[in-house]
Amino acid sequence: MKLLLTIALMLSTVMWVSTQQPQEVHTYCGRHLARTMADLCWEAGVDKRSDAQFASYGSAWLMPYSAGRGIVDECCLRPCSVDVLLSYC
């Protein structure tokens, strides 16, 4: 019985892991970056957030992770995911 349960657990784990797709990363530069951002931000219906929203709390740890870098640094100089792009909307 334990063997059957162990095999079933292993099979379900393997099946679950095989269905998990890693998020694709691409480089986005120039017009391709601008068009992609326009499409993503429009589809997400997200308004541009300003750093002032975070700074008003007075804590540096509330600043967004990418506050020191720009979108070109993160997505043109090296590949990035759609989640990273959406964080700039």
Curated annotation (Swiss-Prot):
Task: Give a Gene Ontology cellular component term annotated to this protein.
Answer: extracellular space
* Top-level taxon: Eukaryota
**InterPro entries from the UniProt entry:** Bombyxin, Bombyxin_A, Insulin-like, Insulin-like_sf, Insulin_CS, Insulin_family
Q: Known PROSITE patterns for this protein? A: INSULIN
All disulfide bonds of the chain are 29-76, 41-89, 75-80
Q: Which residues are annotated as modified residue Pyrrolidone carboxylic acid in the UniProt record? A: 20
Q: Which residues form the signal peptide?
A: 1-19
GO molecular-function annotation terms? growth factor activity; hormone activity
**Annotated SMART domains:** IlGF (SM00078)
Keyword terms: Cleavage on pair of basic residues, Disulfide bond, Hormone, Pyrrolidone carboxylic acid, Secreted, Signal
Task: List localization entries.
Answer: Secreted
What's one Pfam family here?
Insulin
Which residues does the record annotate as propeptide?
A: 50-68
What family does the database annotate? Belongs to the insulin family.
| Quaternary state and interactors | Heterodimer of a B chain and an A chain linked by two disulfide bonds.
Miscellaneous? Silk worm has two kinds of PTTH: 4K-PTTH and 22K-PTTH; there are many forms of 4K-PTTH.
Q: Could you tell me what this protein does?
A: Brain peptide responsible for activation of prothoracic glands to produce ecdysone in insects.
**What is the name listed in the Swiss-Prot or TrEMBL entry for this protein?**
Bombyxin A-8
* Record organism: Bombyx mori
